[in-house]
Structure formats: C-alpha cells, structure tokens
Amino acid sequence: MSVSVVLGSQWGDEGKGKLVDILAGDIDVCARCAGGNNAGHTIVVPIDGVEKSFAFHLLPSGLVNPKCTGLLGNGVVIHLPSFFAELDALESQGLDCTNRLFISDRAQLVFDFHQIVDGLKEVELGGSSIGTTKKGIGPAYSGKASRSGLRVHHLFEPETFAAKFRKVVEGRFKRYGHFEYDTEGEIERYRKLAERLRPYVVDSVAFIHKALASGKRVLVEGANALMLDIDFGTYPFVTSSSTSIGGVCTGLGIPPKMVGKTIGVVKAYTTRVGAGPFPTEQLNDVGVHLQEVGHEYGTTTGRRRRCGWLDLAVMKHSCLINGYDAFNLTKLDVLDGLDEIKVGVSYSLDGKELSSFPADLELLSRVEVNYVTLPGWKTPITEIRNYDDLPANCKKYINFIEEQLKVPIEWIGVGPGRDAMITKRKDQ
C-alpha cells in the first residue's frame, strides 16, 4: 500500500485543507510531516446537519472525517499549549478526536522561549526581517539542527527534561540577554502537560508502517509549500523545514518507494505572506481585486497576503522537485470579474530568457516576467459543479495551465464551500 500526498506548490495558502478534507472521506490515516502551528486553514463541514467552521493550524485536517486517524510525524515541531488549545477548540465544536490522534515520540518541542526568541530575531534583523509568524518554529528547528532541542520522549524523563531545559534556556539568555522568562514555572507546567500528552504519544515510524502493512490508506498533508522550502524556496524568505516531497519521507520515516500519488495544490493566481521577491505581484487594482474578492488574509496571523498573477516559472520549478501526478486548481472563481487574465510563463534577465528558477534573490528581484494574456470569462462560476458547464474561456485557462506544466488538473475549486469543487476527468 502506498502513501498519497497533498503538497502546496506555491508560497502557501493554496487551499490544501479543503482537498484533504474531501479526500479524507476515503482514507484511514491523515499525517503531517513538517512544520508546526505556523500554517493555518479553515474547513467548513456539516456536523449533525449544521455547517460548522473548523480552524486548523497544527492538527491534521483529515480529522474532520470521524473515521480518520490523525498523526503528527517526527518532522513536526509541537507547541503543547497550542496543541491542546486547538484540540479543545475542535472538540468543543463537536469534533471528537478521542483515540484517533497521535504524536511521534521523536517530534521536537516548541517552547514559549522559542516564540520570544523568534520575535527578538526579527527585531535584530530590522529591515531584513523574514516576516515569520513568531510562533517559535524557526528557533525550534534551529535547536534541532544544533542537536540541543528537546523531543517529546524527553517529557517522560522528568529529571533529564528539567536539566536539559534549564541548559537550553540559559543558552538563549547568553545569546539574547536575560529576557523575562520563568524557567522553573515552565518545567512544572510541562510536567503536568506530559501526563495529559502521554495517551497521544506513539512510535510514529512503527505506527505508520503497521498501518500501511495492514492495507490502510494513508494521506500526507503537506504544510506550507514548495516555495517556502528551506532548500528549494526563496531562501532566506522561507520556513525552516523541508516542505517538498523529500520532507514527506524524512518527516514520517517512510521510504521513497512507498510514496504514491502526489497532488499539487495551486491557486489560480499567486499569493505570498511576508517579505521576499514576488515577480508577478500586482500593486494595482488587479492586486486589490484578488485580495478583496479572494479574502486574502492569513488564518494564522490575520496579515494581508500579497497578490499577483499565476506564475508558471514558479510552478515549473515546483514540478521539477515534487513530481506532481495531478493538480487541484483552487479559487478559480476569484478571477470571474476580470476582463483579461495574465499568466507569467517565464523570466528574462538582461534580455535573456532564463531556463531555470534563480537561487540568487538579487537576480530574482531583477527579472522581467514574460506574460501571456488570456481572455476572461466574466461569468460567475461558483454554482457550477460539472466541468462541461464552465465558460469556454475558463476551460481555455485551465487547459493552458495543463499544457504548460504537462500535469493534469483533476480538481477545480470554484468557491469556499466544501461542495464547491469540480472533478475533471482525464478526457475532458
């Protein structure tokens, strides 16, 4: 049995959660392999006949299916107070997660001091700040890389945990000065949290391989997106983990040969949050239209997202690394009101077309985007559920993307509702 994967193909916020929610109806395990509570999305589902909105940040959104088990793998970093706050919020809305949510004993822990340090680092960087969510994700991964981080299993060795915790905090004091922090109070708080956490902790490698060996269907929900990957994104304006297909293997302990269908989620235009080059960004009426009609505000931070045309130079780079088998094109309805739609197909620098995506951001900031202009459809598509019923120009836009990327689009999002998703057959 192989693992299916859903990955963000741009700079995040593509709408991965909605597809995961739909696919979760046919899966047994939904796993996360990277990131922390720095990502976020909202899913609207009917519970007992009433539509309810659930906000996910850290927990796998497949939990909306009551028959699905959620797993946070070893590649995830976990802030326990946020974990329990999110879990309590979901359960208070009627989503029972009893005996169907598990955490890897190898996962790294995020502490409040990581969040404080995250803010201090941004202040230190000043005008060069990356624009993090200040959730402590970067400092936690930094501790992991320097082998000073604490993992979930350390919580169950109280004396060892306390000694390691004091040492790590003291190291942060030496680096950033003595900021206000109750070290002993935190040790006591985590002693109590450890007991509450104990029933959720498993050896995630054994867990997922046992599930696969028994024929269970596993779906991996990627966090963030390819252009935020620590290696392949617009470094340093990236997150601190591997958000590419490679992170699926390292973040869950599964071999590449077990990775099956890989689905890329791509927004019909482009957005990003925070600083960094954005070649197709539209600082004009088009950008305002995309932002307002698309409700482009972050679930985690509430920040306005920067908006621009679809960038196929980004997508070609993304395809090379993740090897998508299919796409879910999302928020296509946001383009309904536009007379014409531009698509960036390549970059030129100093008059020469580039053959690959630049690693050097100084070069990326100077590129000229080569656009193709397509006609708009000027017709609302939110109520359409059959591909054949889409306007002709809308189908031309979809076909153009497929032809350029040589990957089929199997799902098309045409609105925020759970049912606002068109399934496209290969012969259409």
Curated annotation (Swiss-Prot):
Pathway: Purine metabolism; AMP biosynthesis via de novo pathway; AMP from IMP: step 1/2. Substrate binds at T299, T300, T301, G302, R303, R304, R305. GO terms for biological process: 'de novo' AMP biosynthetic process; IMP metabolic process. Keywords: Cytoplasm, GTP-binding, Ligase, Magnesium, Metal-binding, Nucleotide-binding, Purine biosynthesis. IMP binds at D13, E14, G15, K16, N38, A39, G40, H41, T133, R147, N224, T239, R303. The lineage of its organism: Eukaryota, Fungi, Dikarya, Basidiomycota, Agaricomycotina. PROSITE patterns: ADENYLOSUCCIN_SYN_1, ADENYLOSUCCIN_SYN_2. SMART domains: Adenylsucc_synt. It comes from the Eukaryota. It catalyses: IMP + L-aspartate + GTP = N(6)-(1,2-dicarboxyethyl)-AMP + GDP + phosphate + 2 H(+). Plays an important role in the de novo pathway and in the salvage pathway of purine nucleotide biosynthesis. Catalyzes the first committed step in the biosynthesis of AMP from IMP. GTP binds at residues 12-18, 40-42, 305, 331-333, 413-415. Homodimer. One of its GO terms (molecular function) is magnesium ion binding. This is Adenylosuccinate synthetase. The active site is at D13 (proton acceptor), H41 (proton donor). One of its GO terms (cellular component) is cytoplasm. Belongs to the adenylosuccinate synthetase family. InterPro entries: Adenylosuccin_syn_GTP-bd, Adenylosuccin_syn_Lys_AS, Adenylosuccinate_synth_dom1, Adenylosuccinate_synth_dom2, Adenylosuccinate_synth_dom3, Adenylosuccinate_synthetase, P-loop_NTPase. Its cofactor is Mg(2+). Mg(2+) binds at D13, G40. NCBIfam families: PRK01117.1 (NF002223), purA (TIGR00184). It comes from Coprinopsis cinerea (strain Okayama-7 / 130 / ATCC MYA-4618 / FGSC 9003) (Inky cap fungus).
